[in-house]
Regions:
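Short, acidic, metal-binding catalytic loop of nucleotide-sugar glycosyltransferases
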Residues: 24-33
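Active-site nucleotide-sugar/metal-binding loop of Leloir-type enzymes
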Residues: 65-81
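Short beta-strand-to-loop acidic/aromatic patch adjacent to the donor-nucleotide binding site
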Residues: 79-90
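Conserved donor NDP-sugar-binding/catalytic core segment of glycosyltransferases
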Residues: 94-127
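Short, flexible, basic/aromatic active-site loop/helix in glycosyltransferases
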Residues: 114, 130-149
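A short, conserved alpha-helix in the catalytic core of glycosyltransferases
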Residues: 152, 156-167, 174-200
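Nucleotide-sugar-dependent glycosyltransferase catalytic core
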Residues: 176-177, 203-227
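Non-catalytic, C-terminal membrane-associated alpha-helical segments of glycosyltransferases
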Residues: 216-224, 236-297
Length: 297
């Protein structure tokens, strides 16, 4: 198919079987990418055998943001669109075709994420069946760039290459790089619109294998958002950005974790998250908060 070249980038760690099935989903796309990069911090995480067909493996520093940037720096300059997928995605075969076609027709849009018709607590088989059966999304494409859809969702994102090369992901966000999609979205908005595209669809399995601990995740949730405020990266101007931080980021998150803990919903380690939340708050009060402190927990 004619059109701009596409490069797909997947950052992964310790999830070889999950990655293999996601690569199969990518190969079923009606519009294929010119390059598929798998970015790892160790060759132990790299695919092998039939999974490597058409795949370029890159090894670099660990962490979601760092691994993505390793790949971005290797993408040839004639590639117009870079696409990011988590390693636990199942895509409708039309995802790439619909997403890139929309960007080609709308020059004022710099980046999009698709719409997830399911997000978490779903098997690969159920995801495939759902994508075959659910056609509610079909029709004329529309970009949703208001409310909760105003930023990218990094499990799936299609971004114009030129502005992305100028921004990159923030490598001060280590490990799982919590909030990197929100932060990048706000910096990309100076180049154009960012939003969610109605007819680029998929399922995010949210497989928990090899994710960071609850304590680290809880720390990052608070500390990373505080870091964004200190950088001046927020969709709400001060002082309301700080009000949002207290009410939505801190108090709401603590309340949700307490509810999950007392109700026995322990899949995501709510008690560990609460510990991390509280450590982050103490660090903020003591003036030592940093996203990289997660490495010490």
């Amino acid at each position: 198919m004619e059109g701009g070249k596409i490069a797909i980038i997947i950052a992964t760690k310790d999830r070889l079987e999950i990655l293999r099935e996601t690569l199969q989903s990518i190969r079923r796309q009606t519009r294929l990418a010119a390059y598929v990069y798998v970015s790892v911090s160790s060759l132990e995480d790299a695919p092998s055998g039939n999974s490597t067909e058409g795949v370029i493996v890159l090894v670099g520093p660990p962490g979601g943001s760092a691994q993505r940037n390793t790949a971005i720096r290797q993408v040839p300059l004639d590639v117009e669109y870079m696409v990011f997928f988590d390693d636990d995605m199942e895509l409708h075969p039309s995802y790439l075709e619909n997403a890139v076609s929309f960007l080609e027709k709308n020059s004022d849009v710099v980046a999009i994420s698709g719409m997830m018709i399911a997000d978490g607590n779903i098997s690969r088989e159920a995801a495939r069946a759902l994508l075959e059966q659910d056609t509610a999304w079909a029709g004329d494409p529309s970009l949703r760039d208001r409310g909760r859809h105003h930023t990218l969702y990094a499990c799936n994102a299609v971004i114009r290459s030129r502005p992305l090369r100028q921004t990159l992901f923030d490598e001060n966000l280590p490990l799982y790089s919590y909030g990197e999609d929100y932060e990048l979205s706000l910096r990309l908005k100076k180049f154009g619109r960012v939003g969610r595209l109605s007819n680029a669809v998929g399922v995010h399995l949210q497989t928990q294998a090899a994710r960071v601990s609850g304590k680290r995740y809880g720390y990052a949730m608070i500390a990373n958002n505080w870091y964004f405020l200190q950088k001046g990266v927020c969709h709400i101007a001060a002082p309301w950005s700080y009000v949002r931080f207290v009410l939505v980021i801190v108090l709401k998150r603590l309340w949700i974790n307490l509810q999950n803990g007392f109700s026995g919903q322990l899949e995501r380690d709510p008690w560990g998250q609460i510990q991390g939340n509280l450590v982050a708050l103490v660090d903020i009060i003591c003036g030592r908060s940093s996203p990289r402190r997660i490495l010490d927990l």
